[in-house]
UniProtKB/Swiss-Prot annotation:
GO molecular function: C-C chemokine binding; C-C chemokine receptor activity; C-X-C chemokine binding; C-X-C chemokine receptor activity; signaling receptor activity
Disulfide topology: 122-201
Cited SUPFAM superfamilies: Family A G protein-coupled receptor-like
Name recorded for this polypeptide: C-X-C chemokine receptor type 3
Length: 366
């Protein structure tokens, strides 16, 4: 997926071309005019909405996402010798989210004015966006599976295996995401729309390719990771519910938030895209009012999905006690005074324990 502005413009252009190709004229005695298709719907409302809404939203998400994920990466790297498997996945997740939001200023310019960066950067920006879109979802699934093995089966899959096992898993995730992004390198290009008198970064393939790409995004970028997370955390909750102690109750609340946040951020977008795809395929009737509402809904719900990049630092790092302790240590190294007062500081051995031993997560809070 790339931000929805380009995809909508591409469909409008193809719709206009189809209209020209399928028009017929009858200059008979009465000089009548006949056209077999309806004219394209006016898009003034949705385009004006995008020009106002998307640049503001993308700019805000760029600042918050880069700052939050940057802090997570710095804190994790400051203690990289003591990183657990979950912490390593979180580091890669922070990098993926940061790289995704790095492309948002380009899409903000595309929405506000037009694409002014050429076809080369169009391909790179689109591929970078999609690589990190898929990586974010798949890394969350890896974290869920790691926690599931550790808590439900008391198996330290990565800790007791070869040291490179977690690194190889991350390499496999990035390689798979690069494979998923190949259509961006091949089919994305800057295209001038004569009807709109503007250039946009968009896909150049037929409707069948557009539908296939959307199915890939839905299955690989949402449904499969969500199913893995839901199953793993449902089993984790089953184990935690039969345990006692406030620490385990806090962990139970956190694992619920993990699945709920991912689902709430991305489900609306994929439902809207499903409706739009059904309209393209003719399964749902298309009219100008519905098309305009779907266009606006795609812009709003895609923004909700990108917000997940900003939530990840809060959900997977800042709620963890161990993360906050290490962040304070890093700040004190930089010369900041310790503002924690006389709070009790837990021993390092307890904070570094794995879930299978104390059921407390690494400082991700998972």
């Amino acid at each position: 997926m790339v931000p929805e502005m380009s995809e909508r413009q591409e469909f409008q252009a193809s719709e206009f071309a189809y209209l020209l190709e399928n028009s017929s004229y009858d200059y008979g005695e009465n000089e009548t005019y006949f056209c077999c298709t309806s004219p394209p719907c006016p898009q003034d409302f949705s385009l004006n909405f995008d020009r106002t809404f998307l640049p503001v939203l993308y700019s805000l998400l760029f600042v918050l996402g880069l700052l939050g994920n940057g802090v997570v990466a710095v804190v994790l790297l400051s203690q990289r010798a003591a990183l657990s498997s979950t912490d390593t996945f979180l580091l890669h997740l922070a990098v993926a989210d940061a790289l995704l939001v790095l492309t948002l200023p380009l899409w903000a310019v595309d929405a506000a004015i037009q694409w002014v960066f050429g076809s080369g950067l169009c391909k790179v920006a689109g591929a970078l966006f999609n690589i990190n879109f898929y990586a974010g979802a798949l890394l969350l699934a890896c974290i869920s599976f790691d926690r599931y093995l550790s808590i439900v089966h008391a198996t330290q899959f990565y800790r007791r295996g070869p040291p490179a096992r977690v690194a190889l898993t991350c390499v496999a995730v990035w390689g798979l995401c690069l494979l998923f992004a190949l259509p961006d390198f091949i089919f994305l290009s800057s295209h001038h729309d004569n009807r709109l008198n503007a250039t946009h970064c968009q896909y150049n393939f037929p409707q069948e390719g557009r539908t296939a790409l959307r199915v890939l995004q839905l299955v690989a970028g949402f449904l499969l990771p969500l199913l893995v997370m839901a199953y793993c955390y449902a089993r984790i909750l089953t184990v935690l519910l039969v345990s006692r102690g406030q620490r385990r109750l806090r962990a139970m609340r956190l694992v619920v938030v993990v699945v709920v946040a991912f689902a709430l951020c991305w489900t609306p977008y994929h439902l809207v895209v499903l409706v739009d795809t059904l309209m393209d395929l003719g399964a749902l009737a298309r009219n100008c009012g519905r098309e305009s509402r779907v266009d606006v809904a795609k812009s709003v719900t895609s923004g909700m999905g990108y917000m997940h990049c900003c939530l990840n630092p809060l959900l997977y790092a800042f709620v963890g006690v161990k993360f906050r302790e290490r962040m304070w240590v890093l700040l004190m190294r930089l010369g900041c005074p310790d503002q924690r007062g006389h709070q009790r500081q837990p021993s390092a051995s307890r904070r570094d324990s794995s879930w299978s031993e104390t059921t407390e997560a690494s400082y991700s809070g998972l």
